[in-house]
Amino acid sequence: MKILFLSVFITFSLQLSLQTEADFVMTGHNQHLPFRICSIATGTDLVRFDREVSCASYGSNIKTTEGILIIYKTKIEAHTFSVRTFKKELTFQTTYRDVGTVYFLDRTVTTLPMPIEEVHMVNTEARCLSSISVKRSEEEEYVAYHKDEYVNKTLDLIPLNFKSDTVRRYITTKEPFLRNGPLWFYSTSTSINCIVTDCIAKTKYPFDFFALSTGETVEGSPFYNGINSKTFNEPTEKILFRNNYTMLKTFDDGSKGNFVTLTKMAFLEKGNTIFSWEVQNEESSICLLKHWMTIPHALRAENANSFHFIAQELTASFVTGKSNYTLSDSKYNCINSNYTSILDEIYQTQYNNSHDKNGSYEIFKTEGDLILIWQPLIQRKLTVLENFSNASRKRRKRELETNKDIVYVQLQYLYDTLKDYINTALGKLAEAWCLNQKRTITVLHELSKISPSGIISAVYGKPMSAKLIGDVLAVSKCIEVNQTSVQLHKSMRLTKDSSYDALRCYSRPLLTYSFANSSKETYLGQLGLDNEILLGNHRTEECEQSNTKIFLSGKFAHIFKDYTYVNSSLITEIEALDAFVDLNIDPLENADFTLLELYTKDELSKANVFDLETILREYNSYKSALHHIETKIATVTPTYIGGIDTFFKGLGALGLGLGAVLGVTAGALGDVVNGVFSFLKNPFGGALTILLTLGVIGLVIFLFLRHKRLAQTPIDILFPYTSKSTNSVLQATQSVQAQVKEPLDSSPPYLKTNKDTEPQGDDITHTNEYSQVEALKMLKAIKLLDESYKKAEIAEAKKSQRPSLLERIQYRGYQKLSTEEL
């Protein structure tokens, strides 16, 4: 029995599973409204609708006034003025003279302030003196002269080639003087250079110092005149003032240039420089405000505690206080005549026929230190126009001239009234929006009693579960199930004992589902609205005949006829009822905001007293001038020359004398060595040296071989004629003796006889022994024989020698005779 029951159960389960797979419909899920279970948990949040909302009514209290607006800004540019400096540059140069070269060893430069009397001479004559007094101490004072001439001359100023836009320098000595001392001696030369610089100085409020474009500074106000209270921190005994001072404007044309007369001139000695500048009146030469812009058509809006000045051209507003600003400081006096003339000009050209001045001009100051000059205006026909706009709206005939006069006023009035109307309309819209929200909250509160979950989900914008608990709502979050596990049943009829009940049907379709984080166990529920899963299957109704129902699930619409699934279609195929009222509002056009450049780049660059760019340009130009001068002085100096000079200078007077002696010696040796090396470096000298070296090597080899032969055969080497026959030697000797009238030396007695002069061949090779006297006589005879043979060879060479071209031309017409004819 057990086996039979088990087999029947398995068979029934398989049939049920096959039938189940066929009775299910797979549902698509919706990301916005997923399948979920919305049941109230134990711990929930309590919420309520707040209906006590108060809406404040809108009322505009802004008053606008039209007028003319002039804006002044603080002048940040530094005050610039001309400064002229004077100095004398004393240069001591030590040189060492070599053969063809003068070496520059050391250079001592001392800069001294130019004497004030000489400054006046420069300003009027464009020249300075060639001497300068140098104080080493209170008791010692030396006078140096240019080129060591010991004569006080005048030197003309010449412009320096290196210049910039802000600096112009004049000098008297382009190249330092160099003394060419004795050869291989050290010498020292003196040069004096007068340097006058025309440059630009800058000072900034409160004008307690000024800086030159060369980088130098003066700690004092340029407006200090000796008696006023301006700041001046330099020693007052170093400054001098001259009234009605006449001077050359520039030194380009020398003393023939243009002269200018200045009211007051200041001369300050600071360090090694004399500074001079014109003392001006600060009140008349300085203006701390600068005109920025003028707005002929501007509006002023009055708020509770401030004024807003609006300019349509600038797309900006300037905020000020309501109290007028008084320009009591003397630094503002410079703009009084300026803004009054601008106001009068604009009024006469643009508003004279249509507006009247509504009182005098007013002055305000913004938080950004801008000064606003405001001239309020009032339209002459504004009152008439207001009465006209409130009168009857019927058409009236008007003359053409009247229409032209009224059009401009109407447009201006329309602009002002439209602004008020728009602001009022926006305020009313805000008030109406507030009232509408209040009423909507009341409606939602009442609807929450019918469908609390739907209302709460609409408010929060996501699926929520809600339940009315008395006067408040209990809210909880829905639990999402496994979206792929949801299966919709195809039949909505109740089953009773494995057969359908014909009287009862489900009001909502059945479905099975499982949770995401649980086992594969499935649960039974019913499909609710918006993909909500209703727990249980107790929602039934009496079955109706010819019934058609459509249920939405995910993105599909499932169609049931007579409580049985027929097919599915997309939700988008069902036309939606458009119950949403669109609010069509065109956005405002883009406003092109004008960039307000309060200070230009040029003004910002001029705001600083120290101009780094100008200082660096001046430094580089002066450096270039010094480099040009140094290249004219000397070539590269060997390091050992400067070292020797420094060493012997340290030994005092004895060292200087010893250094002079050693300098001469070392210089001579150095020149010889340098000459040899220079000759070897030359291509011709190098090639000649190689050839001479090869010749010397060949000569050594030749002498070595000759010495070797001499050691082996001395007779053949010393007396080469011994290898010849006796008769040829005797004939050559006798012919030479016959031609010589006076013998060079007396012959031995045994050579004067015929018997002795004609030796036999056997006697030459005789081997008898001789005495020392006979041997000496034989050596002398050999000597005479050698000399005779050599003379015979010379005579033979002359005999065969042809006359040269010069001899043939000189002795033309003559015939050469042979020696036998003589």
Curated annotation (Swiss-Prot):
Question: Which ranges does the record list as Intravirion topological domains?
Answer: 705-822
Q: Which InterPro entries would you find in this protein's record?
A: Glycoprot_B_PH1, Glycoprot_B_PH2, Glycoprot_B_PH2_sf, Glycoprotein_B_ecto_C, Herpes_Glycoprot_B
Keywords tagged on the record: Disulfide bond, Glycoprotein, Host cell membrane, Host endosome, Host Golgi apparatus, Host membrane, Host-virus interaction, Membrane, Signal, Transmembrane, Transmembrane helix, Viral attachment to host cell, Viral envelope protein, Virion, Virus entry into host cell
Q: Where is this region: Hydrophobic membrane proximal region?
A: 629-681, 650-670
Q: Which gene encodes it?
A: gB
Superkingdom field: Viruses
GO annotations of cellular component type: host cell endosome membrane; host cell Golgi membrane; host cell plasma membrane; membrane; viral envelope; virion membrane
Q: Which protein, by its recorded name, is this?
A: Envelope glycoprotein B
* Ranges facing Virion surface side: 23-683
* Disulfide pairings: C38-C478, C55-C434, C128-C194, C287-C334, C505-C543
Q: What GO biological process terms are annotated to this protein in UniProt?
A: symbiont entry into host cell; virion attachment to host cell
